[in-house]
């Protein structure tokens, strides 16, 4: 029996908040709900499921591969990473199962670089130039008009730098500033539907900007 489970990406403000929590908590509510769904599937579906999803869906797919015993293969797209706390808690399981996980990413995608990557294989796909950089996260960007994968490429240098910056926040920013900044940035992405106040969002951006400047001055490969 070939059973495939596909998780959807971020749909609303609550899930944007949950994205942020997944970067500084061991587990988020949506991640736990995804694992509960997998565990409630009929026993006759077996323990060799294939899971997939884009963005938040890709994160959920990776999460259930690690935290349940029912997944044999994970094919994620542009799935974001996990908190330091999660990686410490599940270190040995991640090492044992990471080769079940492939994360297909547009070479300029900026979401897959958020937090800690646990995929055993990350595959970067060449994409057409986008005037609006937010469009590099579109799920169909890595496919041709016929629905085939585009040619493989390499991760863009600027997204490598973005990943290093995110790690700077996760590793060095103390609490409660760390969660405050992450929640505020997610509030900006939510826009007018955000539960974060305009003051909180602006404070978060300014704090994150200060860390960005400090991080940039330490990049000797750019500034000598």
List each model region and its residues:
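Alpha/beta hydrolase fold serine-hydrolase catalytic domain that processes acyl esters and thioesters
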Residues: 1-3, 7-48, 68-224
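Gly/Ala-rich beta-loop-alpha elbow adjacent to hydrolase catalytic centers
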Residues: 52-57, 61
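Short glycine-enriched nucleophile-adjacent loop
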Residues: 61-67
């Amino acid at each position: 029996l070939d059973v495939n489970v596909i998780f959807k990406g971020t749909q609303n403000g609550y899930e944007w908040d949950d994205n942020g929590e997944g970067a500084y908590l061991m587990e988020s509510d949506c991640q736990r709900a995804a694992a509960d769904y997998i565990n409630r599937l009929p026993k006759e579906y077996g323990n060799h499921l294939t899971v997939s999803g884009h963005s938040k869906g890709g994160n959920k797919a990776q999460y259930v591969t690690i935290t349940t015993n029912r997944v044999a293969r994970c094919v994620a797209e542009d799935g974001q990473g996990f908190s330091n706390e999660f990686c410490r808690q599940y270190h040995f399981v991640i090492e044992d199962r990471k080769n079940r996980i492939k994360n297909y990413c547009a070479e300029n995608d900026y979401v897959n670089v958020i937090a800690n990557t646990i995929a055993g294989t990350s595959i970067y796909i060449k994409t057409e130039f986008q005037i609006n950089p937010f469009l590099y996260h579109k799920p169909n960007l890595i496919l041709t008009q016929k629905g085939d994968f585009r040619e493989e490429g390499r991760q863009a240098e600027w997204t490598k730098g973005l990943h290093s910056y995110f790690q700077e926040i996760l590793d060095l920013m103390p609490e409660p500033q760390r969660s405050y900044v992450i929640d505020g940035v997610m509030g900006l992405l939510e826009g007018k539907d955000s539960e974060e106040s305009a003051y909180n969002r602006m404070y978060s951006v300014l704090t994150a900007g200060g860390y960005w400047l400090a991080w940039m001055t330490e990049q000797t490969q750019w500034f000598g």
